[in-house]
Curated annotation (Swiss-Prot):
Protein name: tRNA modification GTPase MnmE
Record function comment: Exhibits a very high intrinsic GTPase hydrolysis rate. Involved in the addition of a carboxymethylaminomethyl (cmnm) group at the wobble position (U34) of certain tRNAs, forming tRNA-cmnm(5)s(2)U34.
Annotated residues for binding of GTP: 225-230, 244-250, 269-272
Source organism per UniProt: Legionella pneumophila (strain Lens)
Keyword Transport applies: no
UniProt cross-references to HAMAP family, sorted A to Z: GTPase_MnmE
């Protein structure tokens, strides 16, 4: 790891009452003395100082805080300067810090140093960015839980159980004279099944966290004049799409973002799906299919007065889209019939015009994507889900090796790989490429 000293503005761009400049590294204290006219600083105490340019001209006045390593966020000596929130003043403080020996920090470099100095693990580092970017109260609370180590503790406990199982299996293989018959005594099978069960439980909780963090891409599809634009307007609570009786009014992709019980919902309204000779409409339909293939969930809107629309288009969607994308059929315009709003697992009857049945639709969406708020929930990322899925696949393979082939060495290797995969979640075993990708997504100053 580099041992140079870094500096960055830690507050958002723009003007404000207070702006913070953060410095971290072996020369942080010396740079602070250059800025404050050699006024001594006590660790963990705020000191009021005048702040100077190199020619002893006063730049500003503010508070300077000194955190002596390793008792700091990064584990290094850290200085935080609380000056007035003028972009000009803060830029001058950065320039003076660089002149005194610091360099400008890369995005996320403060958090990266905290990770490399074992102040936080990789889950906690990601949680810092997630807390900053949280789109709802619940997402912020869940990010804080991850930052406080809730998710990490679950992974570490799982790893401890896996380490114990690995030791038992490998000891039996390496020391056959001890006559440990792990292939037949049932202990390994029970321990392995328990670990798989715990992993599935954590995976389910992590999936809820991914929904809260990343949200859900919900694509509205249907024939022209089925009421798609009216539905997106009602879901959004405002007029975001033009609604007319003319078929083919919507020709391009329309996007709107709302919160559905704290889940960020990225709603995409598409052109009506039909054969058309109009070049502009054909391009809109082409883009609609592209969005459908990327969706997390599809709402197929059907005019209840023309139910035959549903069969052909539903079959076309089923044949074209990946099996993992759920399709909810929405029978619209019940206000023109004697029907009332109702729903079942993948079907909703509603009126986009009056709003009747919208609550039922929201309920079905949450059920279809598997959102179930639970105690102990935490924020997670897709890479965490991928690692958990990979670890489970390895454990299931190992279980098969044990049950069907009595292959102890192959079981031991699958357990080792599963352990390594889980350690990638917390960063115990992580490639430099992954670290670079994660920390580069942070804002500068974190």
């Amino acid at each position: 790891m580099s041992i140079d000293t870094i500096v960055a503005i830690a507050t958002p761009p723009g003007r404000g009452g207070v702006g913070i400049v953060r410095i971290s590294g072996p020369n942080a204290y010396a740079i602070a003395l250059c800025l404050n006219g050699n006024k001594a600083l006590q660790p963990r105490l705020a000191t009021f100082c005048s702040l100077y340019k190199g020619n002893n001209e006063v730049l500003d006045q503010g508070l300077v805080l000194y955190f002596k390593g390793p008792h700091s966020f990064t584990g290094e000596d850290v200085i935080e300067i609380q000056a007035h929130g003028s972009p000009v003043v803060l830029d001058l403080l950065i320039k003076e810090s660089i002149a005194a020996g610091a360099r400008l920090a890369r995005p996320g470099e403060f958090s990266e140093r905290a990770f490399l100095n074992d102040k936080i693990d990789l889950i906690q580092a990601e949680a810092i960015a997630d807390l900053i970017q949280a789109s709802s109260d619940t997402a912020a609370r869940m990010a804080l839980k991850s930052l406080q180590g809730d998710f990490s503790k679950k992974i570490n406990q799982l790893n401890e159980e896996l380490i114990y199982l690995r030791m038992y299996v490998e000891a039996a293989i390496d020391f056959p004279e001890e006559e440990i018959d792990f292939l037949n005594d049932g202990n390994v099978s029970q321990l392995l099944q328990r670990i798989i069960g715990r992993l599935e439980e954590i995976r389910s909780q992590a999936n809820q966290g991914v929904l809260l963090r990343e949200g859900l891409s919900l694509v509205i599809a249907g024939r022209p004049n089925a009421g798609k634009s009216t539905l997106i307007n009602n879901l959004a609570g405002r007029d975001v799409a033009i609604v007319t009786e003319i078929a083919g009014t919507t020709r391009d992709i329309m996007r709107e973002h709302i919160l559905l019980d704290d889940i960020p919902l990225h709603i995409i309204d598409t052109a009506g799906l039909r054969d058309s000779d109009d070049l502009v409409e054909k391009e809109g339909i082409k883009r609609a299919w592209q969005e459908l293939k990327r969706a997390d969930c599809v709402l197929l809107v059907v005019d209840i007065n023309n139910p035959d629309q549903q069969n052909s288009l539903h079959n076309e969607l089923k044949l074209t889209l990946p099996d993992k994308i759920p399709i909810i059929t929405v029978y619209n315009k019940i206000d023109t019939t004697k029907l009332t709003a109702k729903c079942d697992e993948h079907t909703v009857y509603l009126s986009a015009k009056t709003g009747e049945g919208l609550d039922e639709l929201k309920k079905v969406i949450k059920q279809v994507v598997g959102y179930q708020p639970t105690e102990g929930q935490f924020l997670a990322r897709r890479r965490h889900l991928q690692a958990l899925d990979e670890a489970k696949a390895l454990l299931l393979t190992g279980q098969s090796q044990l049950t069907n082939h009595k292959a102890g060495e192959l079981l031991a290797e699958d357990l080792r790989l599963a352990h390594q995969t889980l350690c990638e979640i917390t960063g115990e075993f992580t490639s430099d490429d992954l670290l670079g990708k994660i920390f580069s997504s942070f804002c500068i100053g974190k």
